[in-house]
Amino acid sequence: MMAVAAATRIAVVVVAALAALAPGARGLRRDDFPVGFLFGAATSAYQVGWSIMGCSHGGWVWSLPFLVDPGRISDRRNGDVADDHYHRYTEDVEILHNLGVNSYRFSISWARILPSRFGGVNSAGIAFYNRLIDALLQKGIQPFVTLNHFDIPQELEIRYGGWLGAGIREEFGYYSDVCFKAFGDRVRFWTTFNEPNLITKFQFMLGAYPPNRCSPPFGSCNSGDSRREPYTAAHNILLSHAAAVHNYKTNYQAKQGGSIGIVVAMKWYEPLTNSTEDVRAARRALAFEVDWYGFACYLPFL
């Protein structure tokens, strides 16, 4: 039902937008949208300021490369402060309110909640997200919470090789359960992973994102295997997603009344020619980039 509702609302937006472009159109108004339509904004944890505050140990996989080699960014900046959301979240919530949005999608920093392995829940991290969620709700803004947006604790990268190691699946299960318990009484919309297809592509095939793993001809990295590792990472991510969804639906959904899903970055491929080879290549690319994650099962022709 969620997929159908989302598709319907997207269709409404597209139709309304096209109508607004027609000659003599008066433009879009809020009352052109159905009651209950959610207008929103979105961020991710690292992009708005990781901040050492609220983290008692370690760090995450995105912070280390810029500490070890700050020159990889031309002006030597990193995301440790960014717009300092950790300290200025009340201002950000007020800005959202003034914009008139009624939903806000943000990601939780895994490293802020569980900076070390099992059992080490960071109370300061829990407290920060409680404050943020409560501030949003007080302004009539529905929180949409993403559990993982490209980042993992650095310790798990060292211990398991990040998403390349099967052990990280249990770690994600524990982390997601902590979040359901801590925030689920107020959060109605959960996302396990943001764009897992981009995680595998840019972290393990092209090596553009930390941990920067790749191999020729896809890129020139210090380590990695672009022909194998994206599949291994995707396998572990999808099993982690499935376990978290099962746990939520089994143990939390009836009481908390929320829903849970995954966000996939959509794109489309067209064959260069009508040849069988090109048609199959386009189909494989679409299956690898989208279908595999949307259907959450391995497609044999990959």
Curated annotation (Swiss-Prot):
Q: Write the signal peptide boundaries.
A: 1-27
**Organism superkingdom:** Eukaryota
Binding of a beta-D-glucoside occurs at 47, 149, 194-195
Arranged from A to Z, the UniProt key words for this protein are:
Disulfide bond, Glycoprotein, Glycosidase, Hydrolase, Signal
The residues that the database entry marks as glycosylated are 274
Which biological process annotations from GO are given for this protein?
A: carbohydrate metabolic process
Which catalytic residues are annotated? Answer: 195 (proton donor)
Q: Catalysed reaction per UniProt? A: Hydrolysis of terminal, non-reducing beta-D-glucosyl residues with release of beta-D-glucose
Identify one Pfam family in the record.
Answer: Glyco_hydro_1
Disulfide bonds, paired cysteine numbers: 214-221
One Gene Ontology MF term: beta-D-fucosidase activity
Keyword field contains Signal: yes
EC annotation? 3.2.1.21
Family assignment?
Belongs to the glycosyl hydrolase 1 family.
Q: What is this protein called?
A: Putative beta-glucosidase 17
The organism encoding this protein is Oryza sativa subsp. japonica (Rice)
Q: Which gene encodes it?
A: BGLU17
